[in-house]
């Protein structure tokens, strides 16, 4: 029978000093012997996805205390990728993921916490906490802040839905007048919450449902809706139940590694492919799997991508639907239900509610249940009122969207495409693979051959795109932006956005060893591995080289002979694998990250051979 970890600091005469300090935090005599549960919050006023989380920890803590636990809250950092985008701040985004994982480990292990509730929301915070949960393997429940409502404004007397990417793209489009840009900027992000499309933050919060570590509705229920409050209350109660099952009943099935098995990781990846989620999720799932000691690799992702169809298209892959529409269509339980009926889901994986994922689908899939409470839950919709307050409205759609032929979520029979929303490509330029979000690629360019135009940094690429150097038919190469080469593996949202803004979104491809924002669409191929700084072939490309991309056949080839590549490699070995003429100030913290980082095909985690 496992004993409470917290007993290390609360039991025995020799812990009188520690108990004295615990008492100074507010603990009473009868609290010693109860499970101490870390409430891992990430409130910050820097990030709209986290600006409303200040009071969420208190909600969770009250339920923990009422159920017989002791709640102790602490905060992690949180970087806003959108605000950090397009300048040196983006170098810090991915490294913050690992820093968050470490900080959670430090706090939980230093204070011998017995379990944790992870209150996350945005791009690197959920993955960082997920890595920590897998590493620590103590009872854990995830509950996120929820998605932002989609922006809405009138342009040319037509009501349109908006998000962050629209503001970025229109500002770079010289045909859009200043008044329209101003209207879009002021309407694109109307409420608290993670940005309203299927970008990285929302993708990751959806994947925690598929992994079994969060509650139904976690990924799709709006941050502003009153119904979301119940997710926090339930998380507080449920974590105490998980503690009892583990520490009092010796039931290890409630631990994160028992829930997030390889089958669960496959479920999460299948969901990601089916909903056309962010390519960043590949990076984060690979990293979390390594922390969980689960053998889940790019080969598994490739296998799944060849059989899972695209069942949902949401911004940025379409302007028609945002996360509020996914929720109306039944949320993640509905997509998982369609995967289950297509025999593309492991239905026997477990969840933090103590059910199998199959049992959870039966209870919460709106096409299977007549339960009015469930249907009411998924009718929760936007209010259209600017606010930074959680639970500030209780508006509802008149009906759910259960149209699986033409609605937001489709059945396999009526899928947006039988080919999934994400694909892994391999070839001589990406021996260990690269990733493309196929849900955002126009059918006309699923096969594309063009001339390379090479840039040694994101900044140089942006200058080249806006300066007219990039033309139709080019394959834009942005290299030395990988985990090592950046260092930090920047997102390339500005280059892809600017290509669209000048009318080249369907006329060019982009290949990088960096990564993309979840807001990216188009023929944008990232995570090229090995990266240039690790001697990857992308570092050998020269202007004018032909590159052939074939998404249906999962191939990407640099059309240069092996003999020529061998000559170039010998020359580059002599010069060193570093960018030519790039001026970039790199801090000691970033140098440390780059020194230990692996390439993207390994999740950009630390290279343990260097420890």
Swiss-Prot record:
GO terms for biological process: isoleucine biosynthetic process; L-valine biosynthetic process. It comes from the Bacteria. Its cofactor is [2Fe-2S] cluster; Mg(2+). Its EC number is 4.2.1.9. Homodimer. Functions in the biosynthesis of branched-chain amino acids. Catalyzes the dehydration of (2R,3R)-2,3-dihydroxy-3-methylpentanoate (2,3-dihydroxy-3-methylvalerate) into 2-oxo-3-methylpentanoate (2-oxo-3-methylvalerate) and of (2R)-2,3-dihydroxy-3-methylbutanoate (2,3-dihydroxyisovalerate) into 2-oxo-3-methylbutanoate (2-oxoisovalerate), the penultimate precursor to L-isoleucine and L-valine, respectively. This is Dihydroxy-acid dehydratase. It comes from Actinobacillus pleuropneumoniae serotype 5b (strain L20). The gene is ilvD.
């Amino acid at each position: 029978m496992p004993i409470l970890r917290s007993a290390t600091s609360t039991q025995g005469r020799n812990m009188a000093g520690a108990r004295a300090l615990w008492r100074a935090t507010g603990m009473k005599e009868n609290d010693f012997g109860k499970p101490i549960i870390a409430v891992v919050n990430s409130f910050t006023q820097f990030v709209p996805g986290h600006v409303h989380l200040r009071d969420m920890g208190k909600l969770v803590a009250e339920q923990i205390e009422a159920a017989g636990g002791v709640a102790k809250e602490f905060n992690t950092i949180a970087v806003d990728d959108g605000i950090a985008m397009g300048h040196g701040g983006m170098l810090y985004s991915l490294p913050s993921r690992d820093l968050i994982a470490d900080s959670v480990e430090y706090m939980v292990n230093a204070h011998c916490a017995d379990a944790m509730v992870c209150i996350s929301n945005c791009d690197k915070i959920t993955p960082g906490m997920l890595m920590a949960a897998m590493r620590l393997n103590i009872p854990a429940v995830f509950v996120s802040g929820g998605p932002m409502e989609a922006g809405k404004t009138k342009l040319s007397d037509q009501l349109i839905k908006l998000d962050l990417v629209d503001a970025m793209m229109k500002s770079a489009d010289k045909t859009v007048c200043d008044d329209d840009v101003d209207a879009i900027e002021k309407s694109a992000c109307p409420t608290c919450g993670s940005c309203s499309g299927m970008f990285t933050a929302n993708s990751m919060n959806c994947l925690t449902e598929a992994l079994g570590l969060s509650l139904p509705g976690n990924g799709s229920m709006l941050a502003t809706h009153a119904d979301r409050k119940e997710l926090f209350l339930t998380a507080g109660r449920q974590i105490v139940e998980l503690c009892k099952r583990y520490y009092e009943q010796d039931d290890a099935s409630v631990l994160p590694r028992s829930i997030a098995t390889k089958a669960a990781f496959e479920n999460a990846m299948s969901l990601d492919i089916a909903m056309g989620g962010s390519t960043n999720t590949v990076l984060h799932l690979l990293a979390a799997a390594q922390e969980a000691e689960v053998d889940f690799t790019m080969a598994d992702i490739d296998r799944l991508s060849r059989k899972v169809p695209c069942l949902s298209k949401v911004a940025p892959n379409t302007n028609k639907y945002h996360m509020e529409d996914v929720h109306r269509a039944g949320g993640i339980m509905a997509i998982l239900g369609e995967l289950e009926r297509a025999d593309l889901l492991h239905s026997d994986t477990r969840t933090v509610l103590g059910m199998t994922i199959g049992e959870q689908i039966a209870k919460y899939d709106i096409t299977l249940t007549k339960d009015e409470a469930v249907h009411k839950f998924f009718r929760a919709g936007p209010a259209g009122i600017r606010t930074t307050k959680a639970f500030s409205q209780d508006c509802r759609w008149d009906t759910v969207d259960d149209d699986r032929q033409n609605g937001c979520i489709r059945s396999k029979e009526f899928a947006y495409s039988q080919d999934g929303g994400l694909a892994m490509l391999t070839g001589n330029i990406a021996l260990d693979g690269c990733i493309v979000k196929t849900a955002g690629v126009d059918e006309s360019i699923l096969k594309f051959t063009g001339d390379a135009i090479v840039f040694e940094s994101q900044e140089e690429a942006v200058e080249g795109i806006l300066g007219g150097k990039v033309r139709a038919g080019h394959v834009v190469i942005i290299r030395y932006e990988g985990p090592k080469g950046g260092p930090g593996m920047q997102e390339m949202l500005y280059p892809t956005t600017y290509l669209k803004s000048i009318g080249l979104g369907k006329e060019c491809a982009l290949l990088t060893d960096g990564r993309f924002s979840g807001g990216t669409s188009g023929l944008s191929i990232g995570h090229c591995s090995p990266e240039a700084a690790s001697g990857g072939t992308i570092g050998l490309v020269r202007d004018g080289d032909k590159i052939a991309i074939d998404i249906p056949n999962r191939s990407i080839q640099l059309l240069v002979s092996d003999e020529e590549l061998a000559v170039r490699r010998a020359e580059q070995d002599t010069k060193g694998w570093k960018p030519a003429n790039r001026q970039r100030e790199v801090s000691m913290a970033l140098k440390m990250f780059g020194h230990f980082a692996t390439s993207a095909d390994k999740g950009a985690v630390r290279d343990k051979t260097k420890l």
